Amino acid sequence: MEAIDELSQLSDSMKQAASLLADEDPDETSSSKRPATFLNVVALGNVGAGKSAVLNSLIGHPVLPTGENGATRAPIIIELSRESSLSSKAIILQIDNKSQQVSASALRHSLQDRLSKGASGKNRDEINLKLRTSTAPPLKLVDLPGLDQRIVDESMIAEYAQHNDAILLVIVPASQASEISSSRALKIAKEYDPESTRTIGIIGKIDQAAENSKALAAVQALLSNQGPPKTTDIPWVAVIGQSVSIASAQSGSGENSLETAWRAESESLKSILTGAPQSKLGRIALVDTLASQIRSRMKLRLPSVLSGLQGKSQIVQDELARLGEQLVNSAEGTRAIALELCREFEDKFLLHLAGGEGSGWKVVASFEGNFPNRIKQLPLDRHFDLNNVKRVVLEADGYQPYLISPEKGLRSLIKIVLELAKDPARLCVDEVHRVLVDIVSASANATPGLGRYPPFKREVVAIASAALDGFKNEAKKMVVALVDMERAFVPPQHFIRLVQRRMERQRREEELKGRSSKKGQDAEQSLLSRATSPQPDGPTAGGSLKSMKDKPSPQDKETPEVSGLKTAGPEGEITAGYLMKKSAKTNGWSRRWFVLNEKTGKLGYTKKQEERNFRGTITLEECTIEEIPEDEVEKSKSSKDKKANGPDSKGPGLVFKITCKVPYKTVLKAHNALVLKAESVVDKNEWINKLQKVIQARGGQVGSVSMRQSLSEGSLDKMVRKPIDPEEELRWMSQEVRGYVEAVLNSLAANVPKAVVLCQVEKAKEDMLNQLYSSISAIGNERIESLIQEDQNVKRRRERYQKQSSLLSKLTRQLSIHDNRAAAASSYSDNSGTESSPRASGGSSGDDWMNAFNSAANGPSDSLSKYGSGGHSRRYSDPAQNGDAASPGSGSNRRTTPNRLPPAPPPTGSAYRY
């Protein structure tokens, strides 16, 4: 009994462990939530096998009906609990959490009445009882109907027998021991427990087969593990089964009547089965065998349960670490916790901002995406439209002609356009502010400590957001100051350079016009001198000057100028040819192959005609073209360089220059201008015409190209004194100013993000913790205590995990002790010797055992014929078998322990062979 009590404690521990592993509340009673199957005992057997009698013997009271009228017709489940304070005769029935003391007879008759009602029904609902006694082991007994009854089907059997830890009792009467191989109960047990690790064989009604030597021989063979092959791995126990009824009938007022009956049962069995192992006889042996099988099942389950408990313990400890310690109830402790939480929040904030965990990348994305796009989308074209420029200049200069003093108007235009940059700068600040606010919220959510105190978490987020608002205002002031700085001071050198470039352009135009006039006069003088010189081979000298001028010279007839350019494309839109390109490094000329695409408006060149990839490409839309004198190009070259690097430049007007309309931009690579020289005048004129056509078609500017025509002295003076076009001059100046504004906007696009980072991002990194500390320190103790109030859900979770942790430690310790004991017992049993053979005492030979099982195979023996093939018949049993000792007329027919001599055991060394 002590072994069963110990296993009961172990079963409770394993039930609690299963509840913990299933994450159930340890406060709730796990017995009702998760019933264990370690202590379940299911009785299997045919009608009349003595199942109820065996279970009555385990209970210690005849509560289950037996006999013909007490046949089990529905599953009866009795949940036993042992209470040592009760007397051996007391039985406490528990119904709906209420306890009531009942007698075994009243309980038995109540069950018999319930079973007899509706006997014709096929399906029966199970009957559940909860009993407390001082004699019963803490087991859950399941008394199933006879397996040969119609109401028993596979589903009913599986409902109780399929549990992995339920102990299966295969109960057969002694008279049928020789037919054990054909027992249905044994077949069902083998089906659900092939390895027989939770099966116990019970041979009942030994006293009724005391005179049948063959049956007793078969019983002794089974008890000695020498029965059929399918029975050798099952532990067998022999019982009489009616010791409880006998004790009840003979009991007086003594408390030890049950113990006396169990000892008498063991002595009677020893006298009947003299050759059987004495450790397998009687109710005490049955309890010990049950304890052994239950311990074996628990031994198999203990390692996995312990492993699960260890994993669960680690999870609980991690959860407790995440939830933190319990709050200290003091003003200083509360304030210290608040400041520590501020430090944790600041660490998470910095990690999200600079570590890449949060939305810190969105700050850089704003600088590289939205802000530059807003700067590019400013309406510069509308503000630098010529009509708008005229209006601004007139409003700024009053009624004075704007060509006399346009600087004031242009300064005003610069201020107006740069004012537009303030809105994108402010939007950039707002966008970064939103990103920082999101980072604050994400950091607060990622701080474990703040999750325990939602009010304080909201306070920290509010303080951090207020600090970010201050940083935002400072950043807006800074970026607006950057724009105002550019608006307030426009460098005077810019306007000085404007005037200088304008005067330089006028000077070049006048020089070009002067050279054209001088060339015309030289040509006239040359014609006059040739006309007056003698002509030996020509016609008669004389004639007018006009005739001499109109008549072409023979040299011109012999060498007509032909263009060397090539055209290609469906519409002749591609023009290619050689040009001399002036090198900025060597100050010399290099012959290059140039290709003009009129559709794309681009001019590219290669070193050789065979090359496929351009060495440089010029976008003509942004360029201007003008013709320059060769003297200006060649004035820095020595005569030796001219002979070595350049072609003969005696031909007039072969050089022209391509520049960008915006002075600050380059034309090709890092060059502000591209100086080219044609190989002939025809090539130059064709190149210039086509380049002018492309530039004009794409809205570019064409510089002044000198016309090669003879002008008189008067016409030259008239051209020099011609007034400058005011609109053209203003257009040119507005383009120069636009270039300056674009340069300033590009500078702002680079500097505004720096100001934003300084005033918002870096300020948040450096001053966020100080802002939190100063704000929290300014709050009173009462306010701090109201904020540091732990969430009740978190508090309950911590308490629950603390209870689980304590229970886990307790269960792990208890189960580890049992596991170590089981391991020690297993090693001891492995080292111990096998049980000795049954003692020899003369008498029958081993052939009696073999004949017993052979006769079972050939047919029933004579000694068993009076009971039929089904064993002992309940129909002819006396009322004493039902345990009703007080019934009328049953006193004389009471069955007592027979006083017979048992058959002699087989001789020493004999064994049954199959």
Curated annotation (Swiss-Prot):
Q: Where is this region: G1 motif?
A: 45-52
In this chain the GED domain maps to 730-823
Domain observations: The PH domain binds phospholipids. The PRD1 motif (721-728) is necessary for the interaction with SH3P3.
Self-association state and partner proteins as the record states: Binds PtdIns3P. Interacts with SH3P3 (via SH3 domain) and (via C-terminus) with GAMMA-ADR. May homooligomerize or heterooligomerize.
Composition-biased stretches (Polar residues): 523-535, 826-839, 852-866
Q: Which reaction does it catalyse?
A: GTP + H2O = GDP + phosphate + H(+)
GO CC terms of this entry = clathrin-coated vesicle; cytosol; extracellular region; Golgi apparatus; Golgi membrane; microtubule; phragmoplast; plant-type vacuole
Which terms does the UniProt entry file under GO BP? Golgi to vacuole transport
Annotated region G2 motif: the residues are 71-73
- The answer to keyword Glycoprotein applying to this record is no
Q: Where does the UniProt annotation locate this protein? A: Cytoplasm, Cytosol; Golgi apparatus membrane; Cytoplasm, Cytoskeleton, Phragmoplast; Cytoplasmic vesicle, Clathrin-coated vesicle
Q: Where is this region: G4 motif?
A: 204-207
Q: Which residues bind GTP?
A: 45-52, 143-147, 204-207
Q: Which Gene3D superfamilies match?
A: Dynamin, middle domain (1.20.120.1240), P-loop containing nucleotide triphosphate hydrolases (3.40.50.300), Pleckstrin-homology domain (PH domain)/Phosphotyrosine-binding domain (PTB) (2.30.29.30)
Protein species of origin: Arabidopsis thaliana (Mouse-ear cress)
| Residue span, PH domain | 572-696
| Protein name per the record | Dynamin-2A
Keyword field: Acetylation, Coiled coil, Cytoplasm, Cytoplasmic vesicle, Cytoskeleton, Golgi apparatus, GTP-binding, Hydrolase, Lipid-binding, Membrane, Microtubule, Motor protein, Nucleotide-binding
Could you say which enzyme class this protein belongs to?
A: hydrolase
Report the membrane topology from the UniProt record: Peripheral membrane protein
